[in-house]
Amino acid sequence: MPHSDELDAGNVLAVENLNIAFMQDQQKIAAVRNLSFSLQRGETLAIVGESGSGKSVTALALMRLLEQAGGLVQCDKMLLRRRSRDVIELSEQSAAQMRHVRGADMAMIFQEPMTSLNPVFTVGEQIAESIRLHQNASREEAMVEAKRMLDQVRIPEAQTILSRYSHQLSGGMRQRVMIAMALSCRPAVLIADEPTTALDVTIQAQILQLIKVLQKEMSMGVIFITHDMGVVAEIADRVLVIYQGEAVETGTVEQIFHAPQHPYTRALLAAVPQLGAMKGLDYPRRFPLISLEHPAKQEPPIEQKTVVDGEPVLRVRNLVTRFPLRSGLLNRVTREVHAVEKVSFDLWPGETLSLVGESGSGKSTTGRALLRLVESQGGEIIFNGQRIDTLSPGKLQALRRDIQFIFQDPYASLDPRQTIGDSIIEPLRVHGLLPGKDAAARVAWLLERVGLLPEHAWRYPHEFSGGQRQRICIARALALNPKVIIADEAVSALDVSIRGQIINLLLDLQRDFGIAYLFISHDMAVVERISHRVAVMYLGQIVEIGSRCAVFENPQHPYTRKLLAAVPVAEPSRQRPQRVLLSDDLPSNIHLRGEEVAAVSLQCVGPGHYVAQPQSEYAFMRR
């Protein structure tokens, strides 16, 4: 049945009175209530709200992906204008018809790329599949287009990446592959669910610009779901604020940022960390927590002086980690990914050392190598005077009680067959630390400390939002009272209010128990708030390391300055053409087997502040 008369000429999408619910214990639990909005051709609508507010399930309902997950969707109207200009009612489409709509007319970039990419197919095959299905292209034509899309999202060595699998890529690389896949068929509507959450600030800036360029070329409507108000200020035309499944405020981006009316909107904006807010301060500070009832009332931030003098709890010297790449008829190793090259640093009890850098710079690999989750080819890792890199498997397991890891992708690191209570109890059982009754009480306490309810222990991972799942992973890491926590993008999936609570929790635990954090992140505003020291990594090497004050207030290396310049600012009226971005000609850390790359030489430029010498800045700094 034609619906052209029901959709305004300029609109590509219109939704009226959307209601979403889930059945739990034979009760209907409402997730979204009476939500209405429209999207114009070439417009970007940002949907913002806390984790669990209903943002992602709204997107899944539009894609008709909720029914198979047990969602109950009711809507008075859900109209889409296809690329052919035909208007269809999405709720009336059969499963077969929706397969032709998804990808071609409406595409989605999902929040967790590791679980969205098929692990048994190469990256090239997955991108080409959509192109072949919707554009009637041959396999060869589809692969050429797939490479072009990878080039557009600035993946270096795109031809090589086509033949690799998702587990061989970093989190940011996987997210860029997802973006390339979604944009490959030039849809009429693009739904982006936290598309830049896993990306560092420089690549995030490139992706936001890329989406805007393609949007202008194709007059594509974009629904941008995010908790990053800096990104909202940069990309949105209109903003829809959702609180507990209901729309509480909508307006242009200027209206929302400059004259917010609802207390929840004001609270969201007040909770946004601002880069530069720590200028002149020596120690980490708690985030001010803003309540909905009193958005202007702030908890006084307390400086955290926690570093213990003496011997480092963790010492890393000349760490080298490489991954083999096979090719040829005999499948021999011909090249290697130089993921980490001669990295050295110390970590003291009660200290937070942040590793920052682009996706693929070696941050996550460094963290994993410290626990021997990936094997290194050289260097020393010393924990409390004991070399980790030479331990037997039995002794290594005992040591892992004192070093815990919070992984980047929360859904992939939780067992879907276990309740979250069992997942949190598991490390306690493995190490035989607490009897069952005490363990259950410990789980309840941990869940409350990370902002969840004790009764959530009986639920499964798929019943939680991405941010809630990350809080579960943090609770599990804290269960054993470790001496060191390696946090790999631990708060990147959290909205601003919960992020502040989690950072404050980490700071409190650091103050109470002297925990040392290796904090891996691309969020420079959060890094500035939580760090004692900062190390900047590029192509597997540290190019600048020093105190937070030194690195943020007096950055010496060109790459550090570029990272800071790329941070989005929560001010829509600010013009950003002057922002410095990396060259499109990204260098590669893939080299022929046996080829050695010169290690950078760090020069002291201030107390505890070391920077790569100019002559050591080899091809990775394209000026």
UniProtKB/Swiss-Prot annotation:
GO molecular function, a single term: ATP hydrolysis activity
Protein name stated in the entry: Glutathione import ATP-binding protein GsiA
Family matches, as InterPro entries: AAA+_ATPase (IPR003593), ABC_transp_ATP-bind (IPR050319), ABC_transporter-like_ATP-bd (IPR003439), ABC_transporter-like_CS (IPR017871), Oligopep_ABC_C (IPR013563), P-loop_NTPase (IPR027417)
UniProt cross-references to PANTHER family, sorted A to Z: GLUTATHIONE IMPORT ATP-BINDING PROTEIN GSIA, TRANSPORT ATP-BINDING PROTEIN
CDD domains per record: ABC_NikE_OppD_transporters (cd03257)
Keywords: ATP-binding, Cell inner membrane, Cell membrane, Hydrolase, Membrane, Nucleotide-binding, Repeat, Translocase, Transport
Signal peptide, first to last residue: none
Organism: Shigella flexneri serotype 5b (strain 8401)
One Pfam family in the UniProt entry: ABC_tran
Recorded GO CC terms: plasma membrane
Family matches, as NCBIfam families: PRK10261.1 (NF007613), PRK10419.1 (NF007739), PRK11308.1 (NF008453)
Catalytic activity: glutathione(out) + ATP + H2O = glutathione(in) + ADP + phosphate + H(+)
Annotated gene: gsiA
EC number of this enzyme: 7.4.2.10
Protein's job: Part of the ABC transporter complex GsiABCD involved in glutathione import. Responsible for energy coupling to the transport system.
Domain ABC transporter: 15-269, 314-564
Keyword check for Magnesium: no
Cellular localisation: Cell inner membrane
Amino-acid positions noted as binding ATP in the UniProt annotation, renumbered to this chain: 49-56, 357-364
Subunit details: The complex is composed of two ATP-binding proteins (GsiA), two transmembrane proteins (GsiC and GsiD) and a solute-binding protein (GsiB).
Entry's Gene Ontology BP terms: peptide transport; transmembrane transport
Protein family according to the UniProt entry: Belongs to the ABC transporter superfamily. Glutathione importer (TC 3.A.1.5.11) family.
Membrane topology summary: Peripheral membrane protein
